[in-house]
Amino acid sequence: MSKSMYGYVRDAWKKPAESGVKKLLWERMQTWRRQGAVVRLERPTRIDRARELGYKAKQGIIVVRASIRRGGRRKSRYIRGRRTNRMGMRKATPGKNLQSIAEERAATRYPNMEVLNSYWVGQDGKSKYYEVILVDRNSPSVLADKNLAWVADTRGRVFRGKTSAGRRARGLHNRGTGTEKCRPSLTSHKNQGK
């Protein structure tokens, strides 16, 4: 069976050093670092991944690149004239992954749109870069699309952990033994699920 163009693009991203994607990313990231936290793009960087996640080149659908700092939460040291025992310094991590935080920032920048999904496009020593697919919930071309019309019925899905990255942060990508306390929600089991 013959392979499609998307298959070749996918293979190139799976082996970046051999395919030349690594060098291309290294060059592009020098530009990305100088740009803002959320930048609107003309077209997706990874067309194969974008199409897998529901992207279509039509009115009402845009792609933005969101950059977010790497590592744990930046928490300031407790300075109150004494040393507290724990200081609340170590292991202070947010309850969600960086990808879902990047999605939320993109959604805040474009309040008339809903986050459909997102995917990784690169990282360096300080930042991670994700491309977020946003859908205009009032666009006629979106409302006429049988695969995307459901977006018009939802509001703020990214802030409720309904995207793929959000569901992963809630522990819903796992099934079977050991995941009993992830459903119906983490708070219903006193956050013992993760």
From Swiss-Prot:
Classification via Pfam families: Ribosomal_L15e
Gene Ontology BP, a term: cytoplasmic translation
Domain of life: Archaea
Extent of Basic residues compositional bias: 162-173
Key word Ribonucleoprotein present: yes
GO molecular function per UniProt: RNA binding; structural constituent of ribosome
Listed GO CC annotations: cytosolic large ribosomal subunit
Keyword hit for Acetylation: no
InterPro entries: Rbsml_eL15_core_dom_sf, Ribosomal_eL15, Ribosomal_eL15_arc, Ribosomal_eL15_CS, Ribosomal_uL23/eL15/eS24_sf
PROSITE patterns linked: RIBOSOMAL_L15E (PS01194)
Region annotated Disordered, chain positions: 162-194
Biased composition, class Polar residues, residue ranges: 185-194
Key words, A-Z: Ribonucleoprotein, Ribosomal protein
NCBIfam families, per the entry: PRK04243.1 (NF003269)
Similarity annotation: Belongs to the eukaryotic ribosomal protein eL15 family.
HAMAP family per record: Ribosomal_eL15 (MF_00256)
Record-given protein name: Large ribosomal subunit protein eL15
Organism: Methanocorpusculum labreanum (strain ATCC 43576 / DSM 4855 / Z)
Gene assigned in the entry: rpl15e
